[in-house]
Amino acid sequence: FFPGAMSEAREIELAPIVAKVGALDLLIISPDDPEAMVRYSETARASKIPFAADPSQQLARMNGPEIKKLIEGATYLFLNEYELALTLQKTGWSDEELFSQVKIRVTTFGSNGSRIEEHGKPTITVPVPQELAKIDPTGVGDNYRAGFLAGLSWNLGHERCAQIGSLLATYCLETKGTQEYRFTKEEFLRRFQEAYGAEAAAEVSRHLHPRLSA
């Protein structure tokens, strides 16, 4: 692995970006140089910018205090089952203490689907669509989060967001290469309806563009 530009990520300032593009709806802090990740979260808290913490594989490189600084005050926290256990181990937090640090926690459980927890609301559990084949799991989590965040950008509810992410992750699982899958709008909606029903598919359909091609 060669970090390339990531080695200079800690030098990026968020303030000039906000000044240029305007207020941010949500800042996504994905796997990056750990020092940069913590710095972004500190800036987001100080500037009252909503942010999503998505530490992923960088949890292995971060210590407990760094993980705490990254997570505290996040609007969204994305973890898989292993990452959740690792976060609890390194921070010393209980599961309840961890959840209290964020507004919404999204946890994926592989073939057992995903869970969305939000304070004061019922927990949402979303199953995964039936896969056609299991070719390569690399990138499955990234695709889940991409689909989830796309749903957020379309102002969809968390259940729909998780369903979109789950189907996109399934396409990734069925393909060699993290972004090598192909599908048309019709193909995506057909599988989406099979997994989650006609009403859910109709809601998502309004946001998909015909330019999707096989």
Pin down the residues of each PLM region:
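Short acidic/polar capping segments at secondary-structure boundaries
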Residues: A5-E8, L26, D32-A36, S56-L59, ...
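Short glycine/serine/threonine-rich phosphate/pyrophosphate-binding segments
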Residues: A36-V38, R145
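Conserved phosphate-binding/catalytic loop of the ribokinase/pfkB sugar-kinase fold
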Residues: F1-L26, P31
